Curated annotation (Swiss-Prot):
GO molecular function annotations of the record: methylated-DNA-[protein]-cysteine S-methyltransferase activity
Entry EC number(s): 2.1.1.63
Gene: ogt
SUPFAM superfamilies cross-referenced by the UniProt entry: Methylated DNA-protein cysteine methyltransferase domain (SSF53155), Methylated DNA-protein cysteine methyltransferase, C-terminal domain (SSF46767)
Remaining remarks: This enzyme catalyzes only one turnover and therefore is not strictly catalytic. According to one definition, an enzyme is a biocatalyst that acts repeatedly and over many reaction cycles.
Gene Ontology BP, a term: DNA repair
Protein name: Methylated-DNA--protein-cysteine methyltransferase
Family as reported in the entry's similarity comment: Belongs to the MGMT family.
Tagged with keyword DNA repair: yes
GO cellular component assignments: cytoplasm
Positions of disulphide bridges: none
Subcellular compartments: Cytoplasm
Organism for this UniProt entry: Pyrococcus sp. (strain NA2)
Catalytic activity: a 6-O-methyl-2'-deoxyguanosine in DNA + L-cysteinyl-[protein] = S-methyl-L-cysteinyl-[protein] + a 2'-deoxyguanosine in DNA; a 4-O-methyl-thymidine in DNA + L-cysteinyl-[protein] = a thymidine in DNA + S-methyl-L-cysteinyl-[protein]
Length: 173
């Protein structure tokens, strides 16, 4: 199923879309630029899930999930608490390991480089970048907090969105 929520934050309208089922959240996306970009990202999530043999129900149904994601973004709910609501369907063991580590170790308002995450998990920065790029749970799994050593805003459909999320959390470059 798909649920939507619209929120105002820092003078911008943020639309959050959640793909979910009875096991929990299957995917999250958001837009600061209206419905067209949001629909592109929903299609990306659905294609990603289907490519991993995860069944998706495309009917629209209200849920509390968009509000939960917004509460994580604004700091009223912790990433760790919200992580329990994720279905984790179709993820590899490596992705689960990376996402779990990130949720537990990189807190609101903090950033970390791909290299430092890689060192902590004994893998390569490129592997971490790939996991961040495939992250179906942005905001709850805070891939926006992982930055490049030289180019801060890698592996994101819109670098301005990553910067916006960090600004909401109080991070300043």
């Amino acid at each position: 199923m798909i649920s939507y929520g619209r929120f105002n934050i820092l003078g911008r309208e943020l639309t959050i879309a959640i793909v979910w089922n009875n096991k929990g959240i299957q995917g999250i996306t958001y837009s600061l630029d209206g419905i067209e970009f949001l629909e592109e990202q929903i299609s990306r999530i659905i294609n990603h899930l289907k490519s991993r043999n995860v069944r998706v129900n495309l009917s629209q149904e209200e849920s509390e999930y968009p509000e939960l994601v917004f509460m994580v973004l604004t700091g009223y709910v912790s990433n760790e608490e919200a992580f329990k609501e994720l279905s984790l369907e179709g993820l590899t063991e490596f992705e689960i390991k990376v996402y779990s580590w990130l949720v537990k170790n990189v807190k609101r308002g903090e950033v970390i480089t791909y290299g430092k995450v890689a060192k902590a998990l004994k893998t390569s920065p490129l592997a971490i970048g790939g996991a961040m790029r495939r992250n179906p749970y942005p905001i709850i799994v805070p891939c926006h907090r992982v930055i490049g050593k030289r180019n801060k805003f890698l592996y994101t459909p819109k670098p301005s969105y990553k910067k916006f999320l960090l600004e909401v959390e109080g991070w300043t470059s």
